[in-house]
Amino acid sequence: MGDCNISTSDNKQNRKNHEIRVPRVRVIGSDGEMIGVLSRDEALAMAEKEGLDLVEIQPQADPPVCKVMNFGKFKFEQQKKANEAKKKTKQVEIKELKFRPVTDEGDYQIKLRNMRRFLEEGDKVKINIRFRGREMSHQELGRQMAARIEMDLGDDVVIESRPRLEGRQMVMMVAPRKKS
């Protein structure tokens, strides 16, 4: 039968040796070869003869599947796989960029470049357009700024939330478009 898949989906702790309480188990040898259905005592004696542990790897099967292996090494490999999987997942951050309705062209271009970089890295960007003093009476300038940002970013972004007014600032959220 060759290699077997070891699943520990619902069972955090694998039972080993004398913790296994079922009378008959399906045994896989230390070399990965299927040995067959044996009594628990026979399987334990076989594991002890090889100086290894009998580990229950599929308790929900009928009869449960056990493998003769080094339990310490097995746990170490499991931990290593879990750490690798954890490393590969990227936490999405929310970056925030602040604009004003009268943001100068040079500053606008720099912020736009930074925004594109954040989006390429897979982060979401929260855009704040702050109004000061009498600028509140010219909210259309903020809407124009938001529309310009949306136009300049093009099709490589998803607008998660349209520009909305929160107190004295207009807030908009953009995220990178998923590449398929």
Swiss-Prot record:
GO molecular function annotation: ribosome binding; translation initiation factor activity
GO terms of biological process kind: ribosome disassembly
InterPro entries assigned: T_IF-3_C_sf, T_IF-3_N_sf, Translation_initiation_fac3_CS, Translation_initiation_fac_3, Translation_initiation_fac_3_C, Translation_initiation_fac_3_N
Keyword annotations: Cytoplasm, Initiation factor, Protein biosynthesis
Principal place of residence: cytoplasm
Keyword Protein transport listed: no
Subcellular location: Cytoplasm
Pfam families per UniProt: IF3_C (PF00707), IF3_N (PF05198)
Keyword Zinc: no
A GO CC term assigned to this protein in UniProt: membrane
Stated role: IF-3 binds to the 30S ribosomal subunit and shifts the equilibrium between 70S ribosomes and their 50S and 30S subunits in favor of the free subunits, thus enhancing the availability of 30S subunits on which protein synthesis initiation begins.
Subunit-level organization: Monomer.
Family: Belongs to the IF-3 family.
Record-given protein name: Translation initiation factor IF-3
Organism: Xylella fastidiosa (strain Temecula1 / ATCC 700964)
Lineage: Bacteria, Pseudomonadati, Pseudomonadota, Gammaproteobacteria, Lysobacterales
